[in-house]
Curated annotation (Swiss-Prot):
Catalytic activity: Preferential cleavage: hydrophobic, preferably aromatic, residues in P1 and P1' positions. Cleaves 1-Phe-|-Val-2, 4-Gln-|-His-5, 13-Glu-|-Ala-14, 14-Ala-|-Leu-15, 15-Leu-|-Tyr-16, 16-Tyr-|-Leu-17, 23-Gly-|-Phe-24, 24-Phe-|-Phe-25 and 25-Phe-|-Tyr-26 bonds in the B chain of insulin
EC main group: hydrolase
Pfam families per the UniProt record, alphabetical: A1_Propeptide, Asp
EC numbers for this chain: 3.4.23.1
Single GO MF annotation: aspartic-type endopeptidase activity
Cellular localisation: Secreted
Gene: PGA3
Endpoints of the signal sequence: 1-15
Disulfide bonds: 107-112, 268-272, 311-344
Keywords, alphabetical: Aspartyl protease, Digestion, Disulfide bond, Hydrolase, Protease, Secreted, Signal, Zymogen
Record's function text: Shows particularly broad specificity; although bonds involving phenylalanine and leucine are preferred, many others are also cleaved to some extent.
Protein name: Pepsin A-3
Active site: residue positions: 94, 277
Domain Peptidase A1 as annotated: residue spans: 76-385
Length: 388
């Protein structure tokens, strides 16, 4: 009987998981559009999402070119606490980057004044460093310092976590951003200044029982989405998880066999590489095949630069199917056409990301909303299953 009780306790300990609820909010793009500021923003800022994946390093100032404009369309955000007592911040949980950044009281830029700012003097556990970091984007740089403190995330106390405290943030557009900072969940190999990512620090301290985390993004307008640290909750998906090997341990990069529509290959006919990225809202790929897809679904560019589709056409459009590791993952038109306040916008975006293995695709939130996703660091693989 004692052995049965012990085994039960062990099984229970292995099932412990920490959930961080995500709230879906109005994107920065939508806010700027409603305020009549989007056109001016697009003129001033040359949007190039590719810079997120291929940063330009400039030693010794440790410059990392990761433009925050990449988060223009983000809608899912969670709350973390930093310091003792905890100071709360709304962040993007981003599997396409590896650093944790929040504004600080040392920042007097307009964008910082409208967001939560970390005050080291209010935390009894903060440790300063002499390191500085700069993130280049748009027409200037977000400069900051690095420090260590306790990060509260989903009930986990992540002690001695290195993070960035911004000192300057250029451009007024971030004033309207629905988030304070970024929490990166990619591999440590792409971390700026060699900073240990949050999940790595959590695992290294033995705070979770499994070296993995999982993501469920709800199509609901506000609630239901979640990041799960250290576990998998089968109530969020149907069927079984299909596992896909990570091909490059930097981003969560995998191989896509093909992309088809009506049974015909429309892209990636001989296979291609893709990054599964919660920090990118759309499905992005090389400009040429994306242009063909836009044409196939009847999308045309409007004055704001969005690719719009007739809302009445959605019901007649076909699924676009991503075949990954031999398994088909259909994305229906109700998912790849984004509907908002009477307008319908294509969820595809052209972006050239050349690598030694060919052009990269990005499977962003449009895809992840359809498929519960497990990011398994222990086995360097991604698990996918249809959402429940």
């Amino acid at each position: 009987m004692k052995w049965l009780l012990l085994l039960g306790l062990v099984a229970l300990s292995e099932c412990i998981m920490y959930k961080v609820p995500l709230i879906r909010k109005k994107s920065l793009r939508r806010t700027l559009s409603e305020r009549g500021l989007l056109k001016d923003f697009l003129k001033k800022h040359n949007l190039n999402p590719a810079r997120k994946y291929f940063p330009q390093w400039k030693a010794p100032t440790l410059v990392d070119e990761q433009p925050l404009e990449n988060y223009l369309d983000m809608e899912y955000f969670g709350t973390i606490g930093i310091g003792t007592p905890a100071q709360d911040f709304t962040v993007v949980f981003d599997t396409g980057s590896s650093n944790l950044w929040v504004p600080s009281v040392y920042c007097s830029s307009l964008a910082c004044t409208n967001h939560n700012r970390f005050n080291p003097e209010d935390s009894s556990t903060y440790q300063s460093t002499s390191e500085t970091v700069s993130i280049t984007y748009g027409t200037g740089s977000m400069t900051g310092i690095l420090g260590y403190d306790t990060v509260q995330v989903g009930g986990i106390s992540d002690t001695n976590q290195i993070f960035g405290l911004s000192e300057t943030e250029p451009g007024s557009f971030l004033y309207y951003a629905p988030f304070d900072g970024i929490l990166g969940l990619a591999y440590p190999s792409i971390s700026s200044s060699g900073a240990t990512p949050v999940f790595d620090n959590i695992w290294n301290q033995g705070l979770v029982s499994q070296d993995l985390f999982s993501v469920y993004l709800s199509a609901d307008d506000q609630s239901g989405s979640v990041v799960i640290f250290g576990g998998i909750d089968s109530s969020y998906y149907t069927g079984s998880l299909n596992w896909v090997p990570v091909t490059v341990e930097g981003y969560w990069q995998i191989t896509v066999d093909s992309i088809t529509m009506n049974g015909e290959a429309i892209a990636c006919a001989e296979g291609c590489q893709a990054i599964v990225d919660t920090g990118t809202s759309l499905l992005t790929g090389p400009t040429s095949p994306i242009a063909n897809i836009q044409s196939d679904i009847g999308a045309s560019e409007n004055s704001d630069g969005d690719m719009v589709v007739s809302c009445s056409a959605i019901s007649s459009l076909p699924d676009i199917v991503f075949t990954i590791n031999g398994v088909q993952y259909p994305v229906p038109p109700s998912a790849y056409i984004l509907q908002s306040e009477g307008s319908c916008i294509s969820g595809f975006q052209g972006m050239n990301l050349p690598t030694e293995s060919g052009e990269l695709w990005i499977l962003g939130d449009v895809f992840i909303r359809q498929y519960f996703t497990v990011f398994d660091r222990a086995n360097n693989q991604v698990g996918l299953a249809p959402v429940a």
